[in-house]
Amino acid sequence: MNNAIMDMVDKANQKENAPQFDIGDTVDVHSKILEGNKERIQVFTGVVIGRSGKGAQEMFTVRRIVAGEGVERKFPVHSPRIEKVEVKRSGVTRRAKLYFLRDRVGKAVRLKERRRV
């Protein structure tokens, strides 16, 4: 009984058109930012290094290098603040979590590109 109610609430909080992307993909995350009484869209570009959770609580982590420093941001997949997620490039990976990219610098961070036919 309790699980059925939780599943119903979980489905109600999920987006109908959730973004489709995989770990290793280079993505543009368009998120709504509220500054004072104005709302604008901020784009964060980087490599998806992991996904965690399930259902409405699912999160994904995006990593990029800014001015020589690694920056990681976690985004909820089903958040109303996420406008859209664009896949710029698909990467080939054999791991679910790409935390080893944290230790790499420069061209070593690049992943092989998956060819889409």
Curated annotation (Swiss-Prot):
Keywords: Ribonucleoprotein, Ribosomal protein. NCBIfam families: rplS_bact (TIGR01024). The gene is rplS. This protein is located at the 30S-50S ribosomal subunit interface and may play a role in the structure and function of the aminoacyl-tRNA binding site. Belongs to the bacterial ribosomal protein bL19 family. It holds the Pfam family Ribosomal_L19. One of its GO terms (molecular function) is structural constituent of ribosome. GO terms for biological process: translation. One of its GO terms (cellular component) is cytosolic large ribosomal subunit. This is Large ribosomal subunit protein bL19.
